[in-house]
Curated annotation (Swiss-Prot):
Gene3D superfamilies: Aspartate Aminotransferase, domain 1, Type I PLP-dependent aspartate aminotransferase-like (Major domain)
HAMAP family in alphabetical order: GcvPA
Designated name of the protein: Probable glycine dehydrogenase (decarboxylating) subunit 1
Signal peptide residues on this chain, from the entry's feature table: none
InterPro entries registered for this protein in UniProt: GcvPA (IPR023010), GDC-P_N (IPR049315), GDC_P (IPR020581), PyrdxlP-dep_Trfase (IPR015424), PyrdxlP-dep_Trfase_major (IPR015421), PyrdxlP-dep_Trfase_small (IPR015422)
Reaction equation(s) it catalyzes: N(6)-[(R)-lipoyl]-L-lysyl-[glycine-cleavage complex H protein] + glycine + H(+) = N(6)-[(R)-S(8)-aminomethyldihydrolipoyl]-L-lysyl-[glycine-cleavage complex H protein] + CO2
BP GO annotations: glycine decarboxylation via glycine cleavage system; nucleoside metabolic process
KW Disulfide bond (keyword) present: no
Superkingdom of origin: Bacteria
Record lineage: Bacteria, Bacillati, Bacillota, Bacilli, Bacillales
Keyword Oxidoreductase: yes
Keywords, sorted A to Z: Oxidoreductase
A Pfam match: GDC-P
Membrane spanning stretches: none
Source organism per UniProt: Listeria monocytogenes serotype 4b (strain CLIP80459)
Amino acid sequence: MAKHRYLPMTEQDEKEMLDVIGVKSIDDLFQDIPEKIRFKRDYDLKPAKSEPALLRELSQLASKNANTTEYASFLGAGVYSHYIPTVVDHVISRSEFYTAYTPYQPEISQGELQAIFEFQTMIAELTGMDLANSSMYDGGTALAEAAMLASGHTKRKKILISGAVHPESSNVLKTYATGQHIEVEVIPELDGKTDIEALKKALSDDIAGFVVQYPNFYGQVEPLAELEKLVHENNSLLLVSSNPLSLGLLTPPGEFGADIVVGDSQVFGIPESFGGPHCGFFAVTNKLMRKVPGRLVGETVDENGKRGYVLTLQAREQHIRRDKATSNICSNQALNALASSVAMATLGKTGLVEMAKQNLDKSHYAKQKFREKGFEVLFSDGFFNEFVVKLSKPIKEVNESLLDEGIIGGYDLGFYEEKYENHMLVAVTEMRTKEEIDAFVASLEGAK
């Protein structure tokens, strides 16, 4: 009989396992740990609670958190409050889908493989690229993997990255680059966009690629046509990090000639959850197909001529090439990719465009309200759903005050850039109402 109510192992099971490995007791397993540092006291645990009492206590603790159901959120900077269709959680909760791993056995995994194939197809369509992989960990690591691919493809050891790329993504790239002995140079930002003249001076024959964000960290839409011309004239690769929702309205990077497009599909069906887990995407042109990191699902036919889905081009991957694989990414974000697939399919092309349009319209309405009230709003009107407002008080102090009014304020840009101290990055998505936007602007009057 089991010693513990919720542990199925019996004393006999325990004895048999100890006999197999040749020890007499559980204590023998820890003989390498010196006696003097072993924990021998009783654990100072509180008395057990009943399930109702425990749920009550946990609910009380959870109620202290600010959430985007009860609070109006204007916080973005890479993680956004978006509409998630109810059907998303229903589908991803089904047992046949409930895994974060890519299936290796196609004969028993056709549903999962087809779902991943649909994710790849929709990402490729949105980005304007030839193909996309089955997902990455998040947008930051996808960007870093893109830079590694560019370096390997061009045999060059230097990457240029715009100063208007999200600082956290930039830091992830620098971490990856250190281990690969790749130099990373940051091209400064000027008026919220990449400094074109600085980029021209930095381009040389040792540059593997240039990384730009579209729309960028400050919300501005970068001039991809001009950047593409400069980068490709230098025989370097153009790497674009993009918000996939914005591509419902903006010209996709692929149409500008981007070589690699990466980003995060958190905007489709994935809650904020304190910043993770997310789901990166990775899309490329056909010429880079065999160098893509991660899994690729392809469509084929079986011996009976019926359509089927399989993992394809697996010779690139760790489980076959080991240390010579194109990337170290292994298990990925298949469950979150499924969530994004369901969200995109539920919205459909018309719904996705409408969702993007609401982001554009509501954020521009908010910017206009700030200007009408005399706030200094930085940069041009060429933005998607984020813009920068200058305030007279520290953003941390302002945001603490906003919380008392049921509002989650924008991102403190001074956290990364001293020159942007007291500057707030405001995100306005389709979830915000006119009344909430007006109340937000009114609440900031004292910090003008």
